[in-house]
Regions:
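Glycine-rich phosphate/pyrophosphate-handling loop used in enzymes and phosphotransfer proteins
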Residues: 1-188, 192-225
Length: 225
């Protein structure tokens, strides 16, 4: 990482200065205004109406930041322009705004949301895996092997309208590793409709996993159109 802030270019270690980090933290996703189950709009205490009607297959979802500039730009450079050195900065942003339940949820392993083999070859790395590796080392939680879950090829969720996203992920994952009774932390980069995390959680539960928790770098808003 450069010895200057990537946002304001002031002298800094780790790619971000304290002032910019504080500014980002002030614009973080407010847990007091979010559903504690799915991360959507809520009162921060009780599950939202949607979760009460149909609880998701994971216990809780937490997003550290909103998917908006400068976070969206940094993530684009990381994923699509292959600026892999940004992984440390992005993991640091997540660690600056961790889930409030992280240390008391009984989590015994971390699993990165996998890419399909084709997408992995195309991109050269799994952005979620890179973040998960750093978070695993930071919190002393074992990272499950990449071949724990396989993902079939499918159009990227970001290219699809809201109505097609749930159908697009149906049957997307196949669990190959032993996850029985494991309480897992799933790491993803962006949560929008939560369809991918919900489908992955559903398949893990079918394979015998215990409680599942989700942590994403950012949360994006999407119109249901």
């Amino acid at each position: 990482m450069p010895e200057y802030c990537l946002l304001c270019h002031a002298s800094a270690s780790g790619g971000i200065c304290r002032d910019c980090l504080d500014d980002l933290c002030r614009s973080a996703v407010a847990g007091s205004q979010s559903c504690p189950r799915c991360g959507g709009i809520g009162d921060g205490i009780s599950p939202c109406g949607g979760c009460q009607r149909k609880p998701p297959p994971f216990e809780k979802l937490w997003s550290s930041l909103h998917y908006e500039p400068p976070v969206s730009g940094l993530l684009h450079e990381f994923k699509h322009l292959r600026q892999i050195a940004l992984k440390r900065l992005l993991a640091e942003l997540m660690a600056a705004l961790p889930p409030p339940w992280l240390h008391n949820a009984g989590i015994d392993g971390i699993l990165a949301v996998p890419l399909s083999r084709e997408r992995l070859v195309e991109r050269g790395f799994n952005q979620c895996g890179e973040l998960a590796l750093l978070l695993s080392a930071r919190y002393g939680l074992p990272l499950l092997p990449e071949d724990t879950v396989f993902r079939r090829p499918a159009p990227p969720q970001s290219t699809l309208p809201y109505a097609r996203r749930k159908k697009n992920v149906a049957g997307l994952f196949r669990v190959a590793g032993d996850v029985k009774k494991r309480n897992l932390l799933l790491i993803d980069d962006v949560a929008t409709t939560n369809a991918t995390l919900a489908e992955l959680s559903r398949m893990l539960k079918q394979a015998g996993a215990g409680n599942l928790y989700c942590w994403t770098l950012a949360q994006a808003k999407m119109q249901k159109s």
